[in-house]
């Protein structure tokens, strides 16, 4: 986290190899490196304090909520808990030490901490980023293979151990290539006695540039690509499943229209008062019948047709009498009967339509949530990595006076990700959200 700030001090110390005459005539004095941060130090202290407390408390609540239900933890929740722990380390290691070095223009934590603290800062940030990649990969695996999902706790432990091992391995050069430099010898000023700076001391600029590019690839480009690919695949899988259901519903509707076209083209019938009463009776007592039962109105009685009856054969009278006796209806009272599966298709289609609408709403919320995750990561970390690359390749683009102010702005944007991760991965997670609400209620009551 402090690599960009150390570039500023490395640039300050780069002229140390000049001749003594050049140093006495052209080397800038310490007052030339007075920063515009000095005019905003109280504002920066308040802003850093707010961001640090917000990130610490948010991630601590996530950890406490997940610790309460350790028996019901899943792979994603296990990774979210480790993400909250690494973000707490980022807040503890990066915020106070960086702000102190910026405001005091010196390193006041000793030689041992000069070797340890940059290493811990880099490891905590890198582990947090690698856990984001792990969460994206696990979600992709759960969507693509929902039935054969055999991720156990041992897989989670192995994944976390791999993440921390990679973090320690990638950041291992930092303790070696850091040193404590005394400002009095550098600037030849008695006013700077007993003041030190913790700076990088690489064998050559090529080593420093190679390390900068490797961090850019591992901490920003690779996570951004993994998040984009994984979340895009998740959204596509959800949309494909939704389109399959819609296509099946449309196919069923086409089959119904083909087999029973008369249902859509029947004339409108005006209901009488008795029929209206029957419909109100059905609506009033529909809860008394099961879902497979329906109520219909009796067929209106037809006037006797003497001419038609005369044309019928003689033996048809018995059949007609049996039919009339078995189909007697009480006038004005609906008849209830069991609906056949093919007659219940309209109710089924209505339920499918409602489920499709719910899935559409849920898929839109998932799409917005995943898009916000990608944008938050890209926007929060891009300025800091871009600042690091620019200052490594051309350290004269930013003036000495505004160097630390620009760095503080980029650093605060990176710290904002530690504040937003609990919201995006915890408070917007329905399972964790319920645990958080119960935890907050318990804390409020106590």
Swiss-Prot record:
Quote the residue positions with lipidation, kind S-palmitoyl cysteine: 442
> Which cystines does this chain contain?
114-198
One Gene Ontology CC term in the entry: GABA-ergic synapse
Location in or out of the cell: Cell membrane
Residue ranges, Cytoplasmic compartment? 64-77, 139-156, 230-369, 429-446
Q: Which GO terms describe its molecular function?
A: neuropeptide binding; pancreatic polypeptide receptor activity; peptide YY receptor activity
Question: What main location does UniProt list?
Answer: membrane
The reply on keyword Transmembrane is yes
Q: Which Pfam families match?
A: 7tm_1 (PF00001)
Attached carbohydrates are found at 10, 17
Keywords of the record: Cell membrane, Disulfide bond, G-protein coupled receptor, Glycoprotein, Lipoprotein, Membrane, Palmitate, Receptor, Transducer, Transmembrane, Transmembrane helix
Quote the function comment for this protein: Receptor for neuropeptide Y and peptide YY. The activity of this receptor is mediated by G proteins that inhibit adenylate cyclase activity. Seems to be associated with food intake. Could be involved in feeding disorders.
* Family classification: Belongs to the G-protein coupled receptor 1 family.
| Protein's UniProt name | Neuropeptide Y receptor type 5
**Which organism is the protein's source?**
Canis lupus familiaris
Q: Which gene encodes it?
A: NPY5R
């Amino acid at each position: 986290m402090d690599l960009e700030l150390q570039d500023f001090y490395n640039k300050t110390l780069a002229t140390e190899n000049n001749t003594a005459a050049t140093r006495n005539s052209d080397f800038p004095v310490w007052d030339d490196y007075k920063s515009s941060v000095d005019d905003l130090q109280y504002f920066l202290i308040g802003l850093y304090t707010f961001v640090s407390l917000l990130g610490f408390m948010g991630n601590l609540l996530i950890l406490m909520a997940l610790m309460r239900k350790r028996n019901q933890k899943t792979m994603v929740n296990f990774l979210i808990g480790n993400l909250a722990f690494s973000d707490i380390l980022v807040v503890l290691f990066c915020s106070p030490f960086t702000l102190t070095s910026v405001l005091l223009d010196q390193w006041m934590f000793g030689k041992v901490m000069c070797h340890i603290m940059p290493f811990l800062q880099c490891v905590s940030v890198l582990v947090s980023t690698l856990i984001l990649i792990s969460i994206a990969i696990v979600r992709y695996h759960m969507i693509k293979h929902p039935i054969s999902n055999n991720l156990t706790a041992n897989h989670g432990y192995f994944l976390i151990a791999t993440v921390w091992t990679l973090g320690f391995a990638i950041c291992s050069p930092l303790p070696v290539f850091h040193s404590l430099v005394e400002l009095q010898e550098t600037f030849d000023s008695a006013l700077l006695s007993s003041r030190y700076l913790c700076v990088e001391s690489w064998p050559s600029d090529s080593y420093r540039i190679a390390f900068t590019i490797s961090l850019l690839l591992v901490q920003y480009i690779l996570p951004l690509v993994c998040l984009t690919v994984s979340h895009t695949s998740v959204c596509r899988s959800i949309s494909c499943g939704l389109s399959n259901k819609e296509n099946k519903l449309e196919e069923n509707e086409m089959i119904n229209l083909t087999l029973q076209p008369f249902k859509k083209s029947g004339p409108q019938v005006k209901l009488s008062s008795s029929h209206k009463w029957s419909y109100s009776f059905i609506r009033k007592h529909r809860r008394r019948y099961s879902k497979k039962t329906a109520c219909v109105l009796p067929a209106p009685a037809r006037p006797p047709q003497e001419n038609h009856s005369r044309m019928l054969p003689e033996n048809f009278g018995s059949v007609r009498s049996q039919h009339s006796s078995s189909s007697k209806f009480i006038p004005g009272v609906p008849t209830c009967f069991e609906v056949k599966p093919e007659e219940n298709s309209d109710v089924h289609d209505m339920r499918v339509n409602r489920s499709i609408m719910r899935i559409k709403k849920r898929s839109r919320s998932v799409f917005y949530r995943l898009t916000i995750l990608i944008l938050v990561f890209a926007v929060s970390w891009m300025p800091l990595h871009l600042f690091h690359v620019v200052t490594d390749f051309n350290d004269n683009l930013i003036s000495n006076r505004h160097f630390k102010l620009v760095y503080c702005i980029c650093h605060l944007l990176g710290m904002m990700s530690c504040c937003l991760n609990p919201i995006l991965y915890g408070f917007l997670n329905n399972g964790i959200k319920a645990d958080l609400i119960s935890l907050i209620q318990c804390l409020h009551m106590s």
